[in-house]
Design a protein with these regions (language model features):
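A hydrophobic alpha-helical transmembrane-helix feature that marks the membrane cores
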Residues: 2-256
Length: 256
């Protein structure tokens, strides 16, 4: 499922509020971005471990490639509880966006890691649909693509601000198309959604990375606020990664 990319959007005009030397700015920026990526990687690790743990507890055996569910797995995936798993990440995003301003950095980080655990639980059903080998393969493909795109967004001198409105419109479009396809179950529409989803989140990865860089350079904050914003940045890039991964898995993953 595609989510609104971040609870915050930010822009930048001229540098204000930062009086340090260029060396201090560069060191601060590196520390800020390192915090963003570290939090994001920990979040991905939590999601992966939760998804794997729930899958192991839910599958008793495989009949060919078809999973035989345990009673726990039947409760988790075949009862109304499956809707809780599906919708819980959206609830976390809503709460996170409403309370972010009032949270401390440590509370925001805890909330993000809790969200990552819930997201892992929500995605655990993917291991029932796709083979484990293809999930791992697509994960590494996504990691390579994400790393390259994020690096480009960080280093490019070209402003990517013009992409923002286009990408947001595309994101809204694939969300609406996905909702429509719940009723039509069209494989052709799903293929188109997946292709567009990969392209949109590839663009958002570069766009959001550049925006995070600009937010630090022009925002004039440090200390607690910088730590809090690094968590917000981790959430933004985490969602870019997760959505790109899921769309790629839909395109090239091996189904059971």
């Amino acid at each position: 499922m595609a989510f609104e990319n971040s609870p915050f959007r930010y822009g930048a005009q001229q540098p204000t509020g930062y009086a340090g030397t260029q060396v201090e700015v560069d060191q601060g920026l590196r520390a800020f971005m390192l915090g963003v990526y570290n939090n994001m990687v920990v979040g991905l690790g939590i999601s992966g471990l939760v998804a794997l743990g729930l899958n192991m507890a839910s599958v008793a055996a495989y009949q060919g490639t078809r999973p035989i569910l345990t009673p726990f797995g039947q409760t988790l995936y075949l009862s109304p509880l499956k809707w809780v798993l599906m919708l819980a990440p959206l609830a976390f995003i809503f709460v996170f966006s409403m309370r972010m301003d009032r949270m401390s950095a440590s509370s925001a980080r805890t909330m993000f890691f809790a969200f990552a655990a819930v997201m892992g639980a929500s995605m655990s059903s993917l291991l029932l649909v796709f083979t484990g080998g293809s999930v791992v393969q697509v994960f590494f493909i996504t990691a390579a693509a994400f790393g390259s795109l994020s690096l480009w967004g960080y280093t490019t001198k070209r402003s990517l601000s013009g992409m923002g409105s286009f990408l947001m419109m595309g994101l809204i479009g694939i969300i609406l198309a996905s909702l429509v396809n719940i009723f039509f179950a069209s494989s052709a529409l799903q293929f188109a959604i997946s292709v567009l989803g990969v392209l949109i989140f590839a663009g958002l990865t570069a766009y959001d990375t550049q925006k995070l860089k600009e937010m630090y350079l022009y925002g004039g904050f440090d200390g607690e606020m910088a730590a809090k914003m690094s968590v917000n940045g981790a959430l933004t890039l985490y969602l870019d990664f997760i959505n790109m991964f899921q769309f790629l898995l839909s395109l090239i993953g091996d189904r059971r």
